[in-house]
């Protein structure tokens, strides 16, 4: 589990939160992520009473709703080029295969392996580098 500072909220919708966060201890690691607040429902213009910019939250980053475009021969990388979007494009290296929909991979998003959950069955082997896109998610640990 890593610690992150909330820089700003990009959008709130019911229990859903979209925020820009920064890894504590590494100002160069900024992400746009989605997470859920199951105990605070907000309409679009409401302000959270539970969390605000500057607060520190702990959790694990993972990639969800991933789509594997193809195998890649390039360096490990990631980008989030769409304004206010949690979409991530990445080249990752498969390090563990849990099942046909789930892998763990080496990435430069976080220092540890990252969990990747695919929308469809994915055909890959340990050591493969794959190009994917998905949603960058934060599973909060209280």
Question: Residue ranges of each PLM-predicted region?
Answer:
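Single-stranded nucleic-acid-binding OB-fold domains
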Residues: 12-15, 51, 64-72, 96-102, ...
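Acidic (E/D-rich), amphipathic helical modules within compact regulatory domains
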Residues: 20-74
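Beta-strand/loop nucleic-acid-binding surfaces
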Residues: 26-50, 108-126, 131-134, 138
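Structural detector for short beta-strands of small beta-barrel domains
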Residues: 1-16, 77-100, 129-132
């Amino acid at each position: 589990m890593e610690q992150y500072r909330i820089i700003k909220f990009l959008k709130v919708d019911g229990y859903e939160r979209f925020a820009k966060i920064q890894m504590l201890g590494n100002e160069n690691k900024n992400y746009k992520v989605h997470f859920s607040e199951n105990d605070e429902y907000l309409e679009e213009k409401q302000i959270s009473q539970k969390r605000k910019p500057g607060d520190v939250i702990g959790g694990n980053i993972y990639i969800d709703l991933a789509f594997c475009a193809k195998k890649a021969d390039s360096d490990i990388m990631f980008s989030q080029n769409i304004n206010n979007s949690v979409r991530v494009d990445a080249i990752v290296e498969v390090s563990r295969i849990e099942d046909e929909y789930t892998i763990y991979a080496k990435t430069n998003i976080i220092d540890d392996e990252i969990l990747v959950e695919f929308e469809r069955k994915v055909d890959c082997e340990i050591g493969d580098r794959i190009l994917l896109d998905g949603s960058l998610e934060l599973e909060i640990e209280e």
